[in-house]
Amino acid sequence: EVQMAWFGGLSGVQARRLVPGSQAIAQGLEDPDFKSYFIANTSTGLSPSETLTDAFVEQPSFTFGSKGSTSGRLMPEFYLREAFNQSPDQLFEKVGFSGDHSATIALVQSGAYATGAVNYKVWERELEEGKIDTDKVQVIWETPGYPDYHWTVRGDLNDKFGDGFTQRVTDALLAIDDPVLLNAFPREKFIPASNDDFAPIEDTAEAIGLLDAQ
């Protein structure tokens, strides 16, 4: 039985629905303003833009990351639907799910897919590590910010471990300042979070059919 877990935005919402009473207690400093990058192979001729353009969805193929990823599927699909009022399957001849962000970058860089969507932190890390050839793949559009990764605990921790236990766990997370520990996530530091912070994720998942409406 898991008492506490580090979730992405969507997986956290799903977990809290499965375990009523569970609480989001902390998130990374960066997480209230998380982003996805829409990327394209340079052979498409697409250029960076302030908006998603018709030229982007005129490309033949698009790949998400994991089907359950907030930054690699949920929010990118939301913004595609918002911009063009159609599902990805209606917009592109071929829609794929790479399984993870690194694979998405590799598939678009190789030309296996013309376009894709990735977690911005993975892109920035791999760019810094020299794994991305910007002569072959580039960022075309950046989404608005949205909430994502966070810590969630079961709602019965105080009953099992004593009054105030959940708050002590929260305080311990917020107090972490060891660079090695923080870099494991990687986050600059942790800040408070609540279930309400992730209402936009839940609403979006319901709107595109990934969650049943409550």
Name each model feature, range by range.
Residues 1-47, 120:
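Short, glycine-/small- and polar/acidic-enriched structural segments
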Residues 28-37, 131-173, 183-200:
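Periplasmic-binding protein-like
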Residues 28-84:
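A conserved helix-loop-strand patch within extracytoplasmic ligand-binding domains
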Residues 58-82, 167-214:
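Ligand-binding clefts/hinges and TM-proximal coupling segments of bilobed small-molecule sensing domains
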Residues 7-10, 87-106, 147:
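Short helix-initiation/N-cap motifs at beta->coil->alpha
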Residues 6-19, 81-82, 109-110, 114-134:
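A ligand-binding cleft/hinge motif common to bilobed small-molecule-binding domains
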Residues 53-59, 70-97, 124-133, 207-211:
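Ligand-binding cleft/hinge of the Venus flytrap
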Residues 1, 55, 108-109:
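Hydrophobic residues within well-ordered alpha-helices
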